[in-house]
Curated annotation (Swiss-Prot):
Keywords: Electron transport, Membrane, Mitochondrion, Mitochondrion inner membrane, NAD, Respiratory chain, Translocase, Transmembrane, Transmembrane helix, Transport, Ubiquinone
GO cellular component: a single term: mitochondrial inner membrane
Classification via PROSITE patterns: COMPLEX1_ND1_1 (PS00667), COMPLEX1_ND1_2 (PS00668)
Entry protein name: NADH-ubiquinone oxidoreductase chain 1
EC numbers for this chain: 7.1.1.2
Biological process according to GO: mitochondrial electron transport, NADH to ubiquinone; mitochondrial respiratory chain complex I assembly
Primary localization: mitochondrion
PANTHER family: NADH DEHYDROGENASE SUBUNIT 1 (PTHR11432), NADH-UBIQUINONE OXIDOREDUCTASE CHAIN 1 (PTHR11432:SF3)
Claim: Mitochondrion is one of the keywords in the record: yes
Recorded family membership: Belongs to the complex I subunit 1 family.
InterPro entries: NADH_UbQ_OxRdtase_su1/FPO, NADH_UbQ_OxRdtase_su1_CS
Highest taxon of source: Eukaryota
Length: 318
């Protein structure tokens, strides 16, 4: 029974990842005044399936000087972690209901760094290693601000459990009183998932393709799927934390539709940002976090603590 539950969560995610690639190509196409994919199937709808068949039927090529074991394990680990993070997300029922589900998600997203670092190191290519080191520095840096923002959210919620956020936001979405945190959180999720304008790991002009430059066929597809699964997961987490998913026990499907629609809107915002903004320089990326986001998030965290204590309205510890 548990295996069926796992499949009912995993398969829709993989399907969403496949069609997100199509939506991205279409969106970028229209923003650049062209059509995007429109040959394979009606309106290009079969393009992701054709891409999957092409990638998984090709022979993977291993560089002669690479560490073959790590080179193979890295993309598998990346996709496994990207899918594992979905387990505690309430949609409206989580696959695994953890008391510390928010901490679990932060810990799992931190582990993604290892798959990127291994892939860059195992490729034995200076471009791949440079991309991997950039990814590690970027991810670790932006996790600092994400963790501080999460702490502020937990103070408002009174619990690390994600299901409690729906009850906290029954009357008012937290995006309204905490909009500065929401803006910094959204920017941090862009950096955490290595998306434009923070895609320094894949700087085409200097690093060709970044940490996955030596990958082809199936292993490359696994990295690609992991990246897009992480994008959808981060947006789903943003919806849970800031844009309260209304939950009615009589009609849980309404809650799911509500949740999915908000996640789709945020994901389209990711694509919109990619089409609109140029890439940041590395020093600008680090300056933004350490000199702007970190002091602001710490100050807001102290503000939330002091307001709750001064008004004697600390939420119940669930």
């Amino acid at each position: 029974m548990f295996l069926i539950n796992v499949l009912t969560v995993t398969l829709p995610i993989l399907l969403a990842v496949a069609f997100l690639t199509l939506v991205e190509r279409k969106a970028l196409g229209y923003m650049q005044l062209r059509k995007g994919p429109n040959v394979v199937g009606p309106y290009g709808l079969l393009q992701p399936i054709a891409d999957a068949i092409k990638l998984f039927t090709k022979e993977p090529i291993y560089p002669q000087t690479s560490s073959k074991f790590l080179f193979t394990v890295a993309p598998i680990l990346a996709l496994t972690l990207a899918l594992t993070v979905w387990a505690p997300l309430p949609m409206p029922y989580p696959l695994i209901n953890l008391n510390l589900s928010l901490l679990f998600i932060l810990a799992m997203s931190s582990l993604m760094v290892y798959s990127i670092l291994w892939s860059g190191w195992a490729s034995n290519s200076k471009y791949a290693l440079m991309g991997a080191l950039r990814a590690v520095a970027q991810t670790i840096s932006y996790e600092v601000s994400m963790t501080t923002i999460t702490l502020s959210m937990v103070l408002m919620n009174g619990s690390f459990t994600l299901t409690a956020f729906a009850m906290t936001q029954e009357h008012l979405w937290l995006i309204l009183p905490m909009w500065p945190l929401m803006m910094m959180w959204f920017t941090s999720t862009l950096a955490e998932t290595n998306r434009a304008p923070f895609d320094l790991t894949e700087g085409e002009s200097e690093l060709v393709s970044g940490f996955n430059v030596e990958y082809s066929a199936g292993p490359f597809a696994l990295f690609f799927m992991a990246e897009y699964a992480n994008i959808i997961m981060m947006n789903a987490l943003t919806v849970i934390l800031f844009m309260g998913t209304s939950y009615d026990p009589q009609m849980p499907e309404i809650s799911t539709i509500n949740f999915v629609m908000k996640t789709i809107i945020l994901t389209i915002c990711f694509l919109w940002v990619r089409a609109s903004y140029p890439r940041f320089r590395y020093d600008q990326l680090m300056h933004l976090l350490w000199k702007n986001f970190l002091p602001l998030t710490l100050a807001l965290c102290m503000w939330h603590i002091s307001v709750l204590i001064s008004l004697a309205c600390i939420p119940p510890q669930a």
